[in-house]
Design a protein with these regions (language model features):
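Membrane-interfacial helix-loop connectors
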Residues: 1-4, 79-117, 125-131, 156-163, ...
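C-terminal ends of transmembrane helices
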Residues: 12-26, 121-127
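Helix-loop-helix hairpins and the membrane-proximal interhelical loops
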Residues: 31-77, 95
Length: 208
């Protein structure tokens, strides 16, 4: 089970951290401890949100995120606060255990998470040279342009076609697949425009 695996990983991490002198093993121990704590936290959260499917206020809040603008904004803000896209996706997966996360809510939140993931990159670029700042901006623009492109395309088509899966209930696996497909599709769409994005970045951060 997940709890057993987390416990084993935590024990190994503690051994590496406390009883092995080499710094490399200590770093691995820190990673393993962090991973096990994350897994336990996700499992605890999953169990806690399951009863909330019958809570009217909880359902109303999640329904609000079906609005694309609200969902995207929530994803951006949440990821900016957590400083981790992986943690944000994990929490969304945990919330899906309540059975109240639909595709209509998961999609805009996932789009927002992609943009919010640029926040720690932008923060880390403060104080770096111009190339460091340009790298951070490329990360931001890739996520931002991808979100804008797919928002316009998907919701424009949905306004005409009315996709039947919009109200489908999402599971943790489906959310992981959605996040992966969205990221891959964004990369494929933006590949032909890499040079244009580069030009925009150089206009923002000039050589002079």
């Amino acid at each position: 089970s997940t709890a057993t695996i987390s416990a084993i990983v935590a024990i190994i991490g503690i051994i590496f951290k406390m009883f092995v002198k080499k710094s490399g093993f200590k770093n691995v121990g820190d990673i393993m401890l962090g991973f096990s704590i994350l897994m336990v936290g996700m499992q605890t959260m999953s169990g806690a949100v399951a009863p909330l499917k019958d809570n009217e206020h909880f359902v109303n809040v999640l329904t609000m995120f079906k609005n694309p603008a609200a969902g995207i904004l929530a994803g951006i803000l949440f990821t900016a606060v957590l400083q981790s896209a992986s943690a944000s996706v994990g929490i969304l997966q945990a919330l899906s255990m309540s059975g109240t996360i639909t595709f209509a809510a998961a999609l805009p939140i996932t789009m927002g998470i992609g943009v919010g993931a640029a926040c720690p990159v932008l923060l880390s670029s403060i104080g770096t040279n111009k190339n460091g700042k340009r790298t951070a901006l490329i990360y931001l623009f890739n996520d931002l342009f991808g979100m804008l492109f797919w928002s316009i395309v998907f919701y424009s088509v949905n306004a005409v076609v009315h996709f039947p899966f919009m109200n489908a209930t999402m599971s943790p696996v489906l959310i992981a697949m959605l996040n992966t497909v969205f990221r891959a599709a964004t990369i494929l769409v933006l590949l032909p425009f890499i040079k244009w994005i580069e030009k925009i970045v150089y206009l923002v951060v000039k050589d002079s």
